[in-house]
Amino acid sequence: MVYPQKARQLNIQGKVYVRFIIEKDGYVSNVEVARSADPELDAEAARVIRMLPRMEPAKVNGKPVRITYTIPINFRLK
C-alpha cells in the first residue's frame, strides 16, 4: 500500500471501509468503498483490494460460494 502523496502533504488520516466479494472461483469482485475517509485514501484502499491474489473461496457443504467482506483499512501518518 502506498500512502497517497496529496493526503500525506495535507496530513490526512483516516479509516476506509472497503466492501468486496470473493467469488466462487476465488477472485475478488465488486470492490466499493462502504465508508469513506477521503477520496485519495478511498482510491488507494480500493486499489489494494483489487490487487489481492486469487484466494480459496468460502464453502458451504463442500461447495464454493460467493461471500461478501467489509474490512477497515487504516491510514496513519507517523
Task: Annotate the PLM regions.
Residues 2-9, 40, 46-78:
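Short, positively biased Gly/Pro-containing turn/loop motifs at secondary-structure boundaries
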Residues 7-39, 45-52:
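Short tight loops/turns at secondary-structure junctions
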